[in-house]
């Protein structure tokens, strides 16, 4: 418990100070370090330490506080929290358990989702001339779904959730505060674009994928926009998520320690082809095995050549041609 409380208190400092160090040593910008102040909330101290002038409005601190609360916990089924349970069950220490959870959260399918949303909207704003033109926005979203635009994955980021269909209650709350902050910042035009994409995106995803259940926006849809309005750099999007989720991870870790006595060992079911045992002396090379072995040998040779600086680019087309002729 003591270690968990210490991490809740110290991770904001580690994240913000690390970012300032990154700015200074990588971007040659001014390094400034500001100590947290007693009596301020965690959200207030983050804004205080992050900004050069240390100033923030009451609404800014309130919105960040709400965002942290909404991200603090979301059940034991999400990837990073389940990681907390699994690693804790091995009997390891608090720091190792939380480090593993942070490693999970770092993945773009988990904690990095809001950054994907923000990058997608930057792409939309750069390629859609009239943000209020519903038809133009819809056409560009269709291009995204058809893998013709943005990152060519066919995904509208921030839309859909593994559990929620009608609505993500966290998104509903965060959207309300995002509107208030957008009004204060004079960014209602951007907020209107987010609303339009939210309204069109769900139905377009359902249509394109032929889904029968509703597709709603999730909490990542507005969180990146909120962080941007607060002046939080993209490099801190996922660390802010980790700062928020530390209390939830800590609670789950304590729960695992108190209620479980065995290590978690998931069961696996083999879904491949079941082949009978063949004695070694009766085995014959399967069709295609020689080709696979040649590819593996060539890959090893290419890797070795790469380490010594040898250029192997010219060999690739010849190898491909050779394989093509063999198949014919």
Residue ranges and their predicted role:
Residues 1-318, 322, 326-328:
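Non-transmembrane, aqueous-exposed alpha-helical and coiled segments at domain scale
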């Amino acid at each position: 418990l003591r270690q968990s409380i210490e991490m809740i208190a110290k991770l904001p400092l580690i994240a913000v100070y690390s970012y300032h160090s990154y700015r200074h040593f990588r971007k040659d910008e001014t390094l400034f370090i500001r100590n947290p102040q007693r009596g301020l909330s965690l959200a207030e101290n983050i804004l205080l330490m992050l900004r050069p002038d240390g100033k923030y409005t009451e609404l800014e601190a309130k919105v960040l506080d709400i965002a942290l609360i909404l991200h603090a916990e979301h059940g034991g089924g999400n990837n990073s929290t389940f990681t907390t349970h699994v690693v804790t069950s091995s009997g390891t220490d608090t720091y190792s358990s939380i480090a593993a959870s942070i490693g999970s959260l770092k993945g773009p399918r988990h904690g990095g989702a809001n950054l994907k949303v923000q990058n997608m909207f930057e792409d939309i704003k750069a390629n859609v001339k009239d943000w209020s033109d519903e038809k133009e926005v819809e056409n560009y979203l269709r291009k995204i779904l058809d893998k013709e635009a943005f990152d060519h994955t066919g995904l509208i980021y921030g839309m859909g959730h593994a559990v929620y269909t009608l609505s993500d209650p966290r998104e509903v709350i965060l959207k309300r505060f995002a509107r208030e902050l957008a009004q204060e910042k004079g960014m209602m035009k951007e907020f209107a674009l987010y609303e339009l994409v939210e309204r069109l995106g769900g139905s377009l995803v359902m249509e394109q994928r032929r889904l029968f259940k509703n597709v709603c926006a999730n909490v990542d849809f507005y969180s990146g926009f909120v962080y941007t309005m607060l002046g939080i750099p993209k490099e801190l999007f996922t660390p802010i998520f980790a700062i928020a989720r530390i209390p939830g991870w800590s609670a789950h870790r304590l729960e695992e320690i108190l209620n479980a006595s065995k290590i978690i060992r998931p069961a696996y079911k083999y879904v491949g082809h079941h082949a009978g045992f063949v004695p070694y002396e009766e085995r014959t090379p399967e069709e295609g095995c020689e080709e696979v072995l040649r590819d593996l040998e060539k890959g090893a040779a290419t890797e070795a050549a790469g380490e010594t600086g040898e250029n192997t680019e010219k060999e690739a087309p010849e190898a491909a041609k050779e394989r093509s002729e063999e198949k014919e």
